[in-house]
């Protein structure tokens, strides 16, 4: 994305608000497909899920009141979609972009844990088990203040796909 991840847009921008609404819709649509077991998603579902994740990233990059966490989370969602589709190279590309957004904006806590989780899953998909395990350990080691957020991260760290690691 060419949008500076450090930029936050003000409220009251009608076009930005429309992008925000579309970002939410596309994000939620992506999760509807991600929530289905692999055996229940068709090839058409996978394609729609992927397009929805890219649409979410596009709209979040232009949304009113966006912050760097929106960039990181959009990249995380793309990394997860590509991991679920078993394309480790694209998953790692987006996981690295997620991590870069976190580092550039000094995001920590929940977002940093998920950047490590995305890298771990992508590396596992690529068969790079040692690196994947190190990243999964890093994800589990990130301090997360909110107990509910911590529980969500911990749950995702044990949820498949982990590609045999």
What do these predicted ranges mean?
Residues 24, 71-73, 114, 121, ...:
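Residue register of alpha-helical TPR repeats
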Residues 3-7, 43-55, 88-96:
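Helix-turn-helix repeat elements of alpha-solenoid scaffolds
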Residues 16, 62-66, 103-108, 141-148:
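Short coil/turn linkers that connect adjacent helices within long alpha-helical scaffolds
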Residues 17-24, 47, 67-69, 110:
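Residue signature of alpha-solenoid helical repeat architecture, marking inter-repeat boundaries
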Residues 19, 26-33, 52-53, 75, ...:
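TPR repeat positional signature
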């Amino acid at each position: 994305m060419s949008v500076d991840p450090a930029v936050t847009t003000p409220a009251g921008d009608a076009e930005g608000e429309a992008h925000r609404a579309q970002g939410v819709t596309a994000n939620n649509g992506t999760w509807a497909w991600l929530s289905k077991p692999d055996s229940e998603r068709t090839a058409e579902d996978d394609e729609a899920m992927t397009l929805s994740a890219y649409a979410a990233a596009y709209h979040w990059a232009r949304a009113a009141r966006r912050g760097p966490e929106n960039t990181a989370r959009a990249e995380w969602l793309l990394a997860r979609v590509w991991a679920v589709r078993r394309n480790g190279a694209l998953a790692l590309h987006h996981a690295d972009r997620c991590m870069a957004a976190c580092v550039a904006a000094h995001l920590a806590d929940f977002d940093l844990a998920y950047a490590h989780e995305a890298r771990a899953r992508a590396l596992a998909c690529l068969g790079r088990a040692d690196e994947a395990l190190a990243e999964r350990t890093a994800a589990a080691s990130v301090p997360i203040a909110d107990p509910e957020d911590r529980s969500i991260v911990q749950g995702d760290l044990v949820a498949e796909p982990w590609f045999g690691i």
